[in-house]
């Protein structure tokens, strides 16, 4: 093999080789498909089988999966446009810490890109033989430089490439069916340069701007060490090794080469060169092979031996292949595939190659690390290089469906491209505990909590709402608090409804921790911005926190006052009393407008001092009903501040609520339940008002969401809040043990994002809701999830199992939900 770089010129997404071939290159947008969804995976493979059948006549192909830079710092910089001004320092610090901690754990932060190259059919291009000969003659005598001798060469190249525009346009339309997009000229430059700087330090932007072949190939490649190549660039040096695919199982189904390679604990490349075999070669070769196998079987039988199992299997496969290639669309494809690993030392590189071989062996794929063919493989895998008749070693022969089984351009991406770190993808593998699941993953998850209604390209939803469900103790509240911590850094007004009244307790412990105060002052200063409201009627400071007179505008205040009082007093048939009540309400609201310190309790006082005895008695009754009850939260004299709508971060604690069961009839409500329902109306109105400012983004977290689903009033409140979310920039985080709490028929499309922790009694419903197939394997997968693991369905409709992790030790105290006792640590200590 002549070891020469095939590339001669680049024009847009086209590459011209020394031999006069023109290749077109496309980036294939990856698809995230859970491997547990067998039907979706098979459907995807069928689509690629049909693609290869459609483009078989193009003859030569190049599949490439490579680890591109994730550019996390750049993504966090873009995220800063959403950060609140008063949280910029703390957000920037934690984003920098995220980058540092992830790089410490993973090394280079990468994501896999997928490139498909196709050699264009020159037979379809109208180029005079003389022009092509002139160009090839020029290339054979001229320097390798594309730009230095720009004058004539560039002009010829451009006119030459223009001849291919029509045939490339046809191919580009076919590529669109698998989400393929043309590479730009700078991307083409980088894809070629990448092969010479793989695993070495380099700046993608700088390498993409190179304009001549000599600079693109400006790396010393030293093949003197067996099994590896030593690469020296102008910035760095390192080692690469090409691990070649040698054998598959007879049945290649579910070999999933490209997908399997992604789950390795370090970044790798997968390169595959494919060439269509002419049927005029395939048919005689199969006939000859079949004849040989027949003679082998005859010979074995003549000596009294049974036919070898391998001989019988081979004969069956040959017969099957002969039947298959009778179909017009089916061809044999010859292909050569390698996994490329990198390392700073030869030892590291060979060690990674060994791990690759062991890992793929588990998927039924046998690999080899060639000792003396590393340089040949390096040049064979360059863009524009094709297989030829001299390539005999490690060539695989399959039909198009065999190539499709490699599962090109599928990954396990989930979440958003810009956002905060939330955890790790778990590719549905079995682990001993949560920590091992986290440590075995390279796929980290970013999440931006407020993107769904931003008209994202490719998004499957316009709903900003989020559902977090699962059994008690699996991590719902932990996840909700983690997201709330991140949201508190965004320029979003946030409200967390905390019925267990636990957040303040844990946060206060963090604020009182001398070590954290001394070492993490930015985080302490941020936590001190949290505003707490406690709905506890036993605390006099909370009286009037939800008084409509205090926090609502006049019209809405009057309406809500009526609703609250009607919960505990029947005005029907008592027009005089009702008139006095309404008049007193108007007078108190007018007084409030004039700046006087008044509240709903003043309505009762006015009724008590009314000249009519019936009104006085009604006032006395209402006073007794309100006295020492939960209604003190809604009915007070205005001396305490109401819930603040001005604070950016509010935690609203709810205590001592006595709400009826959702199936209970209204006439069976106890007086205590009626009072709690009245408070629910007030709470809902506050949330509704909270989310109704179109000039600002707002979010509410509703922990223990049974509060809103146990009464008709609560359901009404919650539905109204969600409608506000669709109309305004408002998102609701609904945190509940039961998926059924949230997923009524009319509500199923109302949640754009969902996190589902395991709930043994609802696995089937959860799988359906999360776009997962309801199978035994998937139910078992849910059963085996650890505390802190959940299914995550994102804005794009993708679903994956993820392990939640908070990277920052100082945050853990504020995210706690239970106190771990000494005996629990002792339990874990013993083998």
From Swiss-Prot:
Gene Ontology molecular-function annotations: ATP binding
Region (Disordered): 285-311
InterPro entries hit by this protein: ATPase_SAG2001_prd, P-loop_NTPase, T4SS_component
Pfam family for this entry, one: AAA_10
Listed GO CC annotations: cell pole
Keywords assigned: ATP-binding, Nucleotide-binding
Coiled-coil regions listed: none
Residues the entry annotates as binding ATP: 470-477
GO biological process, one term: unidirectional conjugation
Superkingdom of the organism of origin: Bacteria
Protein name in the entry: Uncharacterized protein YddE
Species of origin: Bacillus subtilis (strain 168)
């Amino acid at each position: 093999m002549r070891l020469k770089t095939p590339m001669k010129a680049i024009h847009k997404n086209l590459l011209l080789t020394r031999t006069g071939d023109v290749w077109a290159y496309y980036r294939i947008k990856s698809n995230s498909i859970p491997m547990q969804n067998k039907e979706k995976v098979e459907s995807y493979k069928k689509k690629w089988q049909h693609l290869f059948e459609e483009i078989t006549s193009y003859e030569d192909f190049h599949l490439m999966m490579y680890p591109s830079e994730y550019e996390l710092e750049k993504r966090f910089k873009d995220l800063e446009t959403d950060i609140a001004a008063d949280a910029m320092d703390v957000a920037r610090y934690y984003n920098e810490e995220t980058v540092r901690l992830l790089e410490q754990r993973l090394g280079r932060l990468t994501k896999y890109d997928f490139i498909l190259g196709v050699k264009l059919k020159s037979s379809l291009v109208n180029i005079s033989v003389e022009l092509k000969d002139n160009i090839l003659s020029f290339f054979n005598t001229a320097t390798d430089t594309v730009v230095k001798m720009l004058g004539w060469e560039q002009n010829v190249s451009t006119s030459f490439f223009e001849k291919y525009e029509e045939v490339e346009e046809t191919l580009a339309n076919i590529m669109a069916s698998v989400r393929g997009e043309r590479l730009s000229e700078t991307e083409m430059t980088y894809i070629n340069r990448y092969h010479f700087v793989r695993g070495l330090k380099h700046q993608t932007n700088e390498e993409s701007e190179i304009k001549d072949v000599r600079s693109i190939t400006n790396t010393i490649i030293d093949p003197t060490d067996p099994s590896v190549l030593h690469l020296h660039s102008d910035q760095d040096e390192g080692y690469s090794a090409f691990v070649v695919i040698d054998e598959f199982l007879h049945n290649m189904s579910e070999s999933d080469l490209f997908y399997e390679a992604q789950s390795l604990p370090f970044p790798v490349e997968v390169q595959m060169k494919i060439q269509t075999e002419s049927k005029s070669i395939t048919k005689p070769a199969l006939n000859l092979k079949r004849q040989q196998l027949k003679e082998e079987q005859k010979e074995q039988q003549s000596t009294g031996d049974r036919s070898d199992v391998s001989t019988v299997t081979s004969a069956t496969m040959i017969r099957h292949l002969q039947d298959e290639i009778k179909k017009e669309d089916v061809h044999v494809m010859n292909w050569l595939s390698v996994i490329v690993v990198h390392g700073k030392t030869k030892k590291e590189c060979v060690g990674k190659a060994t791990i690759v071989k062991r890992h793929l062996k588990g998927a039924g794929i046998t690999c080899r690390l060639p000792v003396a063919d590393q340089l040949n493989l390096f040049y064979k895998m360059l863009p524009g290089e094709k297989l030829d008749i001299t390539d005999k070693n490690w060539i695989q022969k399959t039909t198009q469906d065999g190539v499709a089984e490699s599962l090109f351009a599928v990954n396990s991406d989930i979440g958003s491209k810009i956002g905060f770190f939330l955890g790790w993808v778990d590719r549905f593998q079995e682990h001993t505990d949560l920590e091992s699941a986290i440590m075995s993953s390279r796929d980290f998850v970013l999440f931006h909590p407020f993107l769904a209604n931003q008209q994202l390209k490719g998004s499957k939803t316009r709903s900003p709402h989020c559902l977090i469900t699962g059994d008690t103790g699996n991590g719902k509240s932990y996840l909700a608090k983690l997201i709330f911590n991140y949201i508190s850094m965004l320029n979003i007004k946030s409200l967390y409804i905390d019925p267990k009244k636990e957040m303040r307790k844990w946060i206060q412990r963090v604020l009182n921790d001398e070590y954290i105060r001394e070492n993490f002052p930015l985080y302490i200063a941020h936590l001190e911005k949290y505003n707490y409201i406690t709905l506890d009627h036993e605390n006099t400071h909370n009286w009037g926190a939800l008084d409509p007179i205090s926090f609502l505008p006049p019209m809405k205040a009057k309406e809500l006052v009526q609703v609250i009082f009607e919960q505990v007093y029947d005005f029907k048939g008592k027009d005089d009393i009702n008139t006095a009540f309404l008049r007193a309400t108007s007078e108190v609201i007018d007084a409030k407008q004039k700046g006087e310190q008044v509240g709903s309790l003043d309505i009762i006082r006015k009724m008590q001092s009314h000249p009519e005895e019936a009104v006085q008695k009604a006032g006395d009754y209402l006073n007794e009903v309100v006295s020492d009850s939960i209604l003190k939260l809604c009915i007070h004299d205005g001396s305490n501040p109401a819930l603040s709508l001005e604070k950016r971060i509010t935690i609203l604690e709810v205590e001592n609520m006595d709400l009826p069961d959702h199936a209970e009839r209204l006439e069976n409500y106890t007086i205590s339940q009626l009072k709690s329902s009245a408070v629910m109306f007030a709470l809902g109105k506050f949330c509704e008002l909270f989310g109704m400012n179109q000039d600002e983004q707002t979010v509410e977290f509703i922990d223990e969401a049974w509060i809103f689903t146990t009464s008709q009033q609560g359901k009404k409140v919650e539905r109204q809040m969600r409608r506000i979310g669709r109309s305004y920039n408002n998102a609701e985080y609904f945190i509940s043990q039961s998926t059924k709490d949230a997923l009524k028929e009319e509500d199923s499309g109302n949640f754009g994002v969902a996190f589902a922790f395991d709930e043994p009694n609802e696995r089937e419903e959860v799988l359906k809701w999360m776009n997962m197939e309801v199978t035994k394997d998937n139910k078992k997968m849910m059963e085996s999830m650890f505390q802190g693991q959940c299914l995550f369905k994102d804005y794009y409709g993708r679903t994956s199992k993820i392990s939640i992790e908070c990277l920052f030790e100082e945050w853990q105290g504020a995210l706690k939900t239970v106190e771990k006792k000494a005996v629990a640590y002792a339990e874990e200590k013993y083998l």
